[in-house]
Swiss-Prot record:
Membrane topology, as annotated: Single-pass type I membrane protein
Name the UniProt record assigns to this protein: Envelope glycoprotein B
Subunit-level organization: Homotrimer; disulfide-linked. Binds to heparan sulfate proteoglycans. Interacts with gH/gL heterodimer.
An example Gene Ontology CC term for this record: virion membrane
Length: 911
């Protein structure tokens, strides 16, 4: 809502009348609201208050540039139903309405020419040609075989190239290859022989490597692997010839193979122009064979003589036929064929309209010189062939060709080949007019000229078609131009009528500005403004949005103190929104042009003071807030009024507020708008048009990823002798054959005998296989070795023990006896009685031998009684040496006399 300058009721009634008549010119007014109503009457909408400050920032002076730039606005913004308050325009910003302008008639015309068009695009597809790959595949395998299965300990693979002489004499000459290879590694020449047999000539046979673009031939499909005992090394030499496709992209400085290898040499290399062709190889690695005949190893047929290039890499040799760049490569490719094309001439360009394809290409009027195109020799050839085919099929009997093929370079990098066509009737007029001008008779048989040269340039001077002065032709041309002019004039009249209507509307606006300038300027700007007339110009100021919660409506429209007078519009109290600072608030009201404008400064101060003090006003039309309460009238009986407040209406009866009425309860009349139903364009179905297909985009580049991966997968399978590997079953096949023989010859008995033989053989083979597998296991061999070492050590210890027992049996069997004897000898030395000690020792030994003999007999009896209680002689001897007694509970006899006897213990007095 805005606060606008006050006007008399009569003037406002006239303004409303004009607004209703010219509602389209007065699309909006100062105020908008999105408010509700409740109680008496503090109306507010918290949802709308959030945007109050944002809208308030637009308040200020309006320059003339803003008025011009706001000519195109969004009309939906006028009816947002928000409340605005506007400062009184003081003349700081003035605008004027434009004057009616002169309307020009549309007289532009175009020249259209029909014909056949062929469009070309850049050729992004690589150059594809056939190449042959020669190499020898060397495989060296080292195996180890012990008592079990054989093991591969090392496998070395490499490829070496094949010399030109061998290729010419053997491969392409005889269709065979020698299984010997000589190669240089680190300045050392090595030789390899297949199966370690000196070079043998073998025929080249097809391999598993087969694809639509690749074929391969080799001499062997078995990789040699020896399985004799110990370490063995075997060598395989396979001679391989592969036919594949090579690819190269512009500018054709290198090419790639299906193997993934690239060669840094131009595919158009020739020795005659080798300095102008890219080549990274030394001279001895590139050889040009003149009149070379290559052999197809599949059909065994020699090709016609052709110059052929050979490049010798370390791992392979590549050969391909020499090609002419101008006839083989082309930088352009045909895109579209347009049998019905129209060339429309404009001031600076040609528009080539392809209706069937729903496409138009724009090109310069200057024809393109096709000779400027590098490697563009294919363009005229393809264009002539295509246009000739279309003309012979569709236009041969109805049209003739006018001139030759013209080339135009269109925007976007498209090359257009255009052939102009003229109908036979129009061509006759051309020829008749040319004949009259040259005073020569031309018979009607000239109509057959298109079948020969296909052109109407058959006049004596050769330029007859360029003079178009025939009256008959002019009539025909006028008919065509009339139709074209009628269509163009129809559009021109609409434009002229629109211009005249705008001029007349300007006149109405000049009158409306005298009645209600604020409504007029609001409609023009597209947002709420305040305006007043200053002579022949308008003073304009922007408006401040008032939040709905800052507006308080009063429920009575009677003037206090005078019961006979009432307010014409509802009265209210409002407050300006709080500003961020005083300067920002001053910018929201009409600012004076200079500091000497005291009135403007006072107004800014008043506006700043009104931020915090309520301002008395009245609710104006279209959510306007009028400063003051001066709109009064004598009170009338049966008073009933609806006033727009925000988006809804307030109902007053007898100058008292009754209720709030929703806008949906009041019927809206929209018949003030007159719809114009005009079909501007005909229905058009667009045709999908792609410059490059998916296959073309996928095929871009020197290497084809799918082809390289497929080749590598097939290559890995080519030498793995899958089809020739022998599967051994450890002799079961032979035994099975014997069983079948017995069954077939002896019948049922033979079958039983065969089953017995097969069962026994299977058991034997399983046992032998188990033992062989156990011996072949490295852990089993390690365990056997450890067991042998332990047995040897145990044998040495046993041998030493036996030798010791033989030398000193008593000391070996009874080591404790020696200690007792030594102690006894010490006592005997003290007593000086060695003889007695020796005698006693001998008695003890004899007694021990007797006890040992008895114990041996007892042990034998117990072994017979309980076979499970077994013990070795060593265990018995150990127990005897540790305990000096038997391990049985029944035998409680002492082995020897204990040391408690007085013979072995003496008093101190004996020492």
């Amino acid at each position: 809502m805005r606060v606008c300058s006050e006007a008399s009721p009569r003037r406002r009634q006239v303004t409303m009348l004009v607004s209703l008549l010219l509602f389209s010119a007065q699309a909006g007014f100062c105020a908008r609201s999105a408010a509700g109503h409740s109680g008496i009457l503090s109306l507010g909408d918290p949802a709308a208050s959030g945007s109050a400050l944002g809208a308030a920032e637009d308040v200020g002076d309006i320059t003339f540039a803003e008025a011009v730039n706001s000519a195109a606005f969004d009309t939906s913004a006028i009816f947002e139903n928000k409340l605005y308050a506007c400062s009184t325009p003081n003349g700081a910003s003035v605008v004027r309405l434009a004057q009616p302008r002169k309307c020009h008639k549309y007289t532009d015309s175009t020249n259209m020419t029909e014909g056949i068009a062929v469009t070309f695009k850049q050729n992004i597809a690589p150059l594809i040609f056939n190449a042959t790959l020669y190499y020898k595949h060397i495989t060296t395998v080292t195996t180890w075989k012990g008592f079990g299965l054989a093991q591969i300990t090392n496998e070395y693979r490499t490829r070496v190239n094949i010399g030109f002489g061998e290729i010419k004499e053997d491969i392409d000459g005889k269709g065979e290859c020698v299984t010997r290879a000589a190669y240089n590694r680190n300045k050392v020449v090595y030789e390899a022989y297949d199966n370690d047999v000196y070079g043998v000539y073998k025929p080249l046979v097809p391999t598993l490597l087969r694809s639509p673009s690749t074929r391969s031939f080799h001499t062997t499909n078995v990789t040699q692997r020896r399985t004799a005992l110990g370490y063995r090394t075997s060598t395989t030499v396979d001679c391989v010839v592969e036919y594949m496709q090579a690819r190269s992209v512009y500018p054709y400085t290198y090419f790639g193979l299906a193997t993934g290898n690239t060669l840094e040499i131009s595919p158009f290399y020739k020795s005659s122009d080798k300095h102008s062709r890219y080549n990274l190889y030394a001279e001895d690695r590139v050889y040009e064979a003149l009149g070379y005949q290559a052999r197809d190893l599949e059909t065994r047929v020699l090709a016609p003589p052709h110059n052929r290039n050979f490049v010798f890499e370390d791992e392979f040799t590549v050969a391909w036929d020499q090609m002419d760049e101008t006839t083989t490569a082309c930088t352009m490719a045909k895109w579209l064929e347009i049998p019905e094309a129209v060339r429309v001439s404009y001031n600076k360009s040609f528009h080539f309209n392809f209706k069937d394809l729903t496409a138009t290409l724009v090109a310069s009027k200057t024809p393109f010189n096709i000779s400027r195109l590098h490697l563009g020799g294919c363009v005229p050839r393809i264009a002539n062939e295509t246009i000739e085919a279309i003309y012979g099929k569709k236009y041969k009997n109805t049209h003739v060709r006018s001139g030759g093929i013209e080339y135009y370079l269109a925007n976007g990098g498209f090359l257009i080949a255009f052939q102009r066509l003229v109908s036979n009737d129009l061509a006759e007029l051309y020829l008749d007019e040319a004949a009259r001008q040259n005073h020569s008779a031309v018979s009607r048989s000239k109509r057959a000229a298109p079948s020969g040269g296909g052109s109407i340039l058959s006049g004596p001077a050769g330029d007859l078609i360029n003079t178009h002065t025939s009256a008959t032709f002019a009539m025909l041309q006028f008919t065509y131009d009339k139709i074209q002019k009628h269509v163009n004039m129809l559009i021109g009249n609409l434009l002229e009528a629109w211009c005249e209507m705008q001029n007349r509307q300007l006149v109405v606006w000049h009158e409306i500005k005298k009645l209600n300038p604020a409504s007029l300027m609001t409609s023009m700007y597209g947002h709420a403004v305040a305006a007043r007339l200053l002579g022949d110009v308008l003073a304009v100021s922007k408006c401040l949005e008032i939040p709905i919660e800052n507006v308080v409506m009063q429920d009575s429209m009677r003037v206090p103190g005078d019961p006979s007078m009432c307010y014409v519009r509802p009265v209210l109290v409002f407050k300006y929104p709080a500003a961020a600072d005083s300067e920002a608030m001053r910018g929201r009201v009409a600012r004076p042009a200079n500091n000497s404008d005291v009135g403007g400064s006072q107004q800014a101060g008043e506006a700043e003071a009104q931020q915090h003090v309520g301002v008395h006003g009245q609710l104006g039309e279209h959510n306007e807030i009028l400063h003051g309460r001066t709109l009064i009238e004598p009170c009338k009986a049966s008073h009933r009024r609806y006033f727009l407040f925000g988006a809804n209406y307030l109902l007053y009866e007898d100058y008292k507020f009754i209720r709030q009425v929703n806008a949906s309860e009041i019927e809206e009349i929209s018949s003030t708008f007159v719809n114009l139903d005009v079909t501007l364009l005909e229905d058009l179905d667009f045709v999908p048009l792609a410059v490059y297909t998916r296959e073309e985009l996928r095929d871009v580049g020197t290497l084809n990823y799918d082809e390289v991966v497929r080749y590598n997968n097939l290559y890995n399978k080519m030498f793995r002798d899958l089809d020739t590997a022998l599967k051994f079953d450890d002799g079961l096949a032979t035994l099975r054959a014997i069983g079948e023989f017995l069954t077939n010859t002896l019948g049922g008995a033979g079958k039983v005998l065969g089953n017995v033989v097969m069962g026994a053989a299977a058991a034997i083979i399983s046992t032998v296989s188990g033992i062989s597998s156990f011996l072949a296991n490295p852990f089993a061999a390690l365990g056997i070795g450890i067991a042998v070492i332990v047995c040897v050590i145990m044998g040495l210890l046993a041998f030493r023990y036996v030798m010791t027992l033989r030398a000193n049996p008593v000391q070996t069997l009874f080591p404790g006896i020696i200690d007792v004897g030594e102690k006894a000898r010490q006592h005997a030395t003290v007593r000086k009685d060695e003889d007695a000690s020796d005698k006693e020792l001998a008695e003890r030994v004899l007694r021990g031998l007797e006890i040992l003999s008895f114990e041996s007999e007892v042990r034998k009896r117990r072994e017979k009684a309980a076979a499970s209680a077994k013990s070795t002689l060593a265990k018995r001897i150990g127990q005897f040496l540790r305990h000096r007694k038997t391990s049985t509970k029944d035998d409680t006899r002492k082995l020897l006399k204990t040391f408690d006897d007085e013979d072995y213990y003496y008093d101190d007095e004996h020492l």
